[in-house]
Amino acid sequence: MGLNLNDKKAVVAEVSAQVANAQTIVIAEYRGIEVTDLTVLRKKARESGVYLRVLKNTLVRRAVADTAFAALADHMVGPLIYSVSADPVAAAKVLSDFAKSNDKLVLKAGSYAGKVLDKAGVQALASVPSREELLSKLLYVMQAPVAGFVRGLAALAAQREEAAA
């Protein structure tokens, strides 16, 4: 059953709202995936804060027109699942991880920072650590010298106390 005009307008408005806040869009072909597997993928996407939906390509073309993602329109052919995320890495990571365990999901393309990415580009983007991981590594690197200095001072103080006693 097809969508009527009002439903189509609502879908375009919903997708446009998601795209307005997005940094990354990744598209993949989902031919032959079982419903249970697709449900697992949707759950992982929800947990990662990724908008994941199977949509008509023409509606998505309208939603991304006049945005940084408009160049993806050339890749919108066939049965596709769209992954949209405000986190630059999350959308690519969710689909790429799922594609590793399910060979029926084929990554097609993606767009990040106004550039269209091919399958290899999407996989490279997925391999980048998330923002939280990068911040925790940066914090560790910044804390390590200070923590070492404090331990050295504590050891020096303990040594002087022993010498004084």
From Swiss-Prot:
<keyword id="KW-0699">rRNA-binding</keyword>
<comment type="function">
    <text>Forms part of the ribosomal stalk, playing a central role in the interaction of the ribosome with GTP-bound translation factors.</text>
</comment>
<protein>
    <recommendedName>
        <fullName>Large ribosomal subunit protein uL10</fullName>
    </recommendedName>
</protein>
<dbReference type="InterPro" id="IPR001790">
    <property type="entry name" value="Ribosomal_uL10"/>
</dbReference>
<dbReference type="GO" id="GO:0070180">
    <property type="term" value="F:large ribosomal subunit rRNA binding"/>
</dbReference>
<comment type="similarity">
    <text>Belongs to the universal ribosomal protein uL10 family.</text>
</comment>
<dbReference type="InterPro" id="IPR022973">
    <property type="entry name" value="Ribosomal_uL10_bac"/>
</dbReference>
<dbReference type="InterPro" id="IPR047865">
    <property type="entry name" value="Ribosomal_uL10_bac_type"/>
</dbReference>
<dbReference type="GO" id="GO:1990904">
    <property type="term" value="C:ribonucleoprotein complex"/>
</dbReference>
<keyword id="KW-0689">Ribosomal protein</keyword>
<comment type="subunit">
    <text>Part of the ribosomal stalk of the 50S ribosomal subunit. The N-terminus interacts with L11 and the large rRNA to form the base of the stalk. The C-terminus forms an elongated spine to which L12 dimers bind in a sequential fashion forming a multimeric L10(L12)X complex.</text>
</comment>
<dbReference type="InterPro" id="IPR043141">
    <property type="entry name" value="Ribosomal_uL10-like_sf"/>
</dbReference>
<dbReference type="GO" id="GO:0006412">
    <property type="term" value="P:translation"/>
</dbReference>
<dbReference type="GO" id="GO:0005840">
    <property type="term" value="C:ribosome"/>
</dbReference>
<keyword id="KW-0694">RNA-binding</keyword>
<dbReference type="Pfam" id="PF00466">
    <property type="entry name" value="Ribosomal_L10"/>
</dbReference>
<keyword id="KW-0687">Ribonucleoprotein</keyword>
